[in-house]
Curated annotation (Swiss-Prot):
GO BP terms, alphabetized: gluconeogenesis; glyceraldehyde-3-phosphate biosynthetic process; glycerol catabolic process; glycolytic process
Record EC number: 5.3.1.1
Catalytic activity: D-glyceraldehyde 3-phosphate = dihydroxyacetone phosphate
Statement: the UniProt record of this protein carries the keyword Cytoplasm: yes
The protein's name: Triosephosphate isomerase
UniProt-listed PROSITE patterns: TIM_1, TIM_2
Gene giving rise to this polypeptide: tpiA
Annotated pathway: Carbohydrate biosynthesis; gluconeogenesis; Carbohydrate degradation; glycolysis; D-glyceraldehyde 3-phosphate from glycerone phosphate: step 1/1
Role, per record: Involved in the gluconeogenesis. Catalyzes stereospecifically the conversion of dihydroxyacetone phosphate (DHAP) to D-glyceraldehyde-3-phosphate (G3P).
Binding of substrate, residues: 10-12, 173, 213, 234-235
Molecular function as annotated in GO: triose-phosphate isomerase activity
Keyword terms: Cytoplasm, Gluconeogenesis, Glycolysis, Isomerase
Length: 251
């Protein structure tokens, strides 16, 4: 089965609403002929303008987080129905920065993934190990555990629609990239884990990204690996030229 490569930008806390709209308007024409699925993950306040700017193009829009409840006394949070009403396509769940700074756990990731599907959003589920964990040789064990908990209670059809992003924490924003072989190995472990849980068909269908200092220079080699179906791109997704090259890695 051929899986459509997904080039997703995670802007993190960057760009004002005006800057975001200008960026997407400029990006549209540049990636119109891309074979990849192009996604921009923008701050909450940028979502309305970016969804509008992306209309009629092949750019999909992602939120960077969501709450698992529909509504309620959760000051500062944003719910699935709010994102769905805006026309958001994807939501990034469990990014390492959310886990590190904001108390995200494997259990809250699972609740958010269920909420995403309930409200028609596709989750981009982030998993990955720290440098210490890699050095201790527990990468495979840890990532398998994160995947299993994140997907707990989901149907096979839901899992096929999900995206998993392997982001080694030691390679995020550090300039260190996992070697192609390291990235491929862990993405392969994730696919094998999905196969054990949901069978061969689901494992073949689900898209697994690599995230961790993906840039215009290394995207093609990474995306051509058998088990890597694109990237969750940080800093390089904030630069038009770089993100265009990543989205069109095969041209």
């Amino acid at each position: 089965m051929s899986r459509k490569v997904i080039a997703a930008g995670n802007w993190k806390m960057n760009k004002t609403p005006k800057e975001a709209v200008e960026f997407v308007q400029a990006l549209k024409g540049r990636v119109a002929d891309a074979d990849t699925e192009v996604v921009v993950g923008v701050p909450f306040v940028c979502l309305p303008g970016v969804v509008e700017a992306a209309k009629g193009s092949n750019i999909k829009v992602a939120a960077q987080n969501m709450h698992w409840e529909e509504k309620g006394a959760f000051t500062g949070e944003v719910s699935g129905p709010m994102l769905a009403e805006l026309g958001v396509d994807y939501v990034i769940i469990g990014h390492s920065e959310r886990r590190q700074y904001f108390g995200e756990t494997d259990e809250t990731v699972n609740k958010k993934v269920h909420a995403a599907f309930k409200y028609g959003l596709k989750p981009i589920i982030c998993v990955g190990e720290s440098l210490t964990q890699r050095e201790q040789g527990v990468t495979a064990e840890l990532v398998r555990y994160q995947v299993k908990i994140a997907l707990l209670g989901l149907s096979a059809e839901q899992v096929k629609e999900a995206v998993i992003a392997y982001e080694p924490i030691w390679a995020i924003g550090t300039g260190k990239t996992a070697t192609n072989e390291q990235a491929e190995e862990v993405c392969g472990i994730i696919r094998e884990c999905i196969k054990e849980l949901y069978g061969q068909d689901v494992a073949e269908a689900i898209r697994i990204q690599y995230g961790g200092s993906v840039n215009a220079a290394n995207a093609a080699e990474l995306f051509n690996m058998p088990n890597i179906d694109g990237g969750l791109v940080g800093g390089a997704s904030l630069k038009l030229d770089d993100f265009e090259k990543i989205a069109k890695y095969n041209k």
